């Protein structure tokens, strides 16, 4: 949000890690603006686009381009567009959760692909930088829990999930559970950007 000038930048991650825990600040960026930012995404062209409807359409256009050609062009393997759309939709419904591959498959309508095919499709989405999962983590070095825990599911930008779910700012304001999960994903996206 800072890069799109929607954050004040008052709180510094560097200062927090250096021990300065005196955090204060105020922003007039309200919940409606947050819902819009979730659906618009952080795409450079969308951030500077003054026409709201055009800015909101960019993530959906990206998804369609991805499904129509990009996902097949990257390695020359022809993938089933319907399966890819259903996988992305399931991924969007499971955003910010530790959904396993079997959960994603069970969430698909109709006959899901085999476990190997699903793994290939998820790997293709990751290699195309469409998804960017947060690895399982446990503070105890020898804990087996981290080995058994699925990563937390995230798209590289939560607007992809909004596009796949046909979510609009208005719909998100009427579904605060989905709003919260997408907001969590946006926070992860921004923290990753700030950390780089």
Region locations from a protein language model:
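Conserved small helical "lid"/interfacial subdomain of P-loop NTPases
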Residues: 1-17
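A residue-level signal for conserved active-site and pocket-lining positions in enzyme catalytic cores
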Residues: 4, 41, 87
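Short polybasic/polar patches that bind polyanions
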Residues: 6, 38, 106
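Amphipathic alpha-helical "lid/sensor" segments that cap RecA-like P-loop NTPase cores
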Residues: 18-65
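Accessory nucleic acid-recognition modules appended to NTPase machines
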Residues: 47-196
């Amino acid at each position: 949000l800072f890069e799109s000038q929607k954050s004040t930048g008052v709180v510094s991650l560097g200062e927090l890690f250096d021990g300065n825990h005196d955090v204060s600040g105020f922003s007039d960026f309200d919940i409606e603006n947050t819902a819009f930012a979730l659906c618009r995404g952080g795409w450079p062209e969308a951030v500077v686009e003054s026409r709201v409807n055009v800015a909101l359409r960019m993530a959906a256009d990206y998804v369609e381009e991805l499904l129509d050609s990009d996902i097949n062009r990257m390695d020359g393997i022809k993938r089933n567009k319907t399966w890819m759309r259903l996988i992305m939709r399931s991924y969007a419904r499971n955003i910010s959760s530790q959904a396993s591959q079997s959960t994603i498959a069970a969430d698909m309508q109709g006959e899901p692909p085999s476990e190997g095919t699903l793994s290939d499709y998820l790997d293709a989405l990751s290699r195309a930088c469409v998804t960017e999962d947060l690895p399982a983590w446990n503070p105890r070095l020898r804990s087996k829990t981290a080995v058994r825990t699925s990563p937390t599911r995230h798209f590289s930008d939560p607007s992809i999930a909004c596009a796949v779910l046909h979510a609009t700012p208005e719909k998100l304001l009427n579904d605060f559970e989905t709003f919260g999960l997408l907001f969590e994903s946006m926070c992860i996206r921004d923290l990753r950007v700030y950390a780089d």
